[in-house]
Amino acid sequence: MDANSLTSLATTLLEQARGASSGRAAHTLHGGRGHRLQQAVVALAGGESLTEHENPGEATLQVMLGRVELRAGEDVVVLSAGEHVVIPQQRHSLHAHEDSVVLLSLVGTR
C-alpha cells in the first residue's frame, strides 16, 4: 500500500498545466485497463476548459484548488476548493475560472 501526497501532486500538475500549450495536465492515481474504479488528478490553468464530452460511467468531481464551472445541459454549478459534486449522466464540460486542480473519480465498465 502506497500513500500519495495529493497536495504535492496538485502543485506539480498546476505548474505543468501553466506551461502546457493545452493549459492542462493530468495524472492517473488509480485505474486503467482492467479496473472499474479510475481516479485522476487534473490541473487546468485559469481560463482553460475540458470541452463537452460523454460521461462513461458514474463519476464525481472534487475541487482541490481553485474554482471551476461544471456544465451539463442547462445545469451549471460553480465549485470552489473543498467542494464535491456527482457528475450527471449526460454530456458535460468543465471550465477553470482560475488555476484549478480537481480529483476525478469514475466507476465505468471494464
Where do the protein language model's features map onto the residues?
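Glycine- and acidic-residue-biased ligand/ion/polar-headgroup-sensing regions
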Residues: 57-73
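Conserved short histidine dyad/triad with adjacent acidic residue
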Residues: 23-26, 38-55
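Ligand-binding loop in jelly-roll beta-barrel domains
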Residues: 89-110
